Amino acid sequence: NRRERYTLAQLNDMRGVFGTRPYRAPNDPCCVVAVQNFKGGVGKSTLAVHLAQYLAIRGYRVALVDCDSQASATTLFGYVPDLDLTEHDTLYPFLREGERSSLDYALRKTHFDGLELIPANLRLFNSEYELAARMAQGNGALLDRLKEGIESISDRFDVVVMDPPPALGAISLSVLRAAN
């Protein structure tokens, strides 16, 4: 069999050489997509992962943000969330501390060229209670914290896909506010 085989990285290199790799103009905003439904078990995580993979295969630079403490999207990339990851590998420190100015610390390369993941694990659920308690004290700006985080990494990506939890909680509301 004399068929040539190419990796996605090689295809993206060829797209770069021939000028066919999709890109967004520097003044165009990053597309932020939320695959959201308030019911569980309807395929949100599967759809979010497949959308992110499809866009990466097409040559786009994609970030997938797993905002769900069930961590289904994270699991689909080969992680055992509560064994392989700590809370410091997720959105949790960014949402909780307010000390971090960017989500760069949480980005992880995947086996898809052009696709990076911000993973989740069960400890991310703690942020639901913490955000709700702090918002009850009058700090409604916390709902925009995730949007600020997405903006901090948006210059590196064409598309950001978010996989929120199946509930109408603080994280879900933050995801809605961050999506465009």
Protein language model annotation of sequence segments:
Residues R2-A179:
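P-loop NTP-binding core
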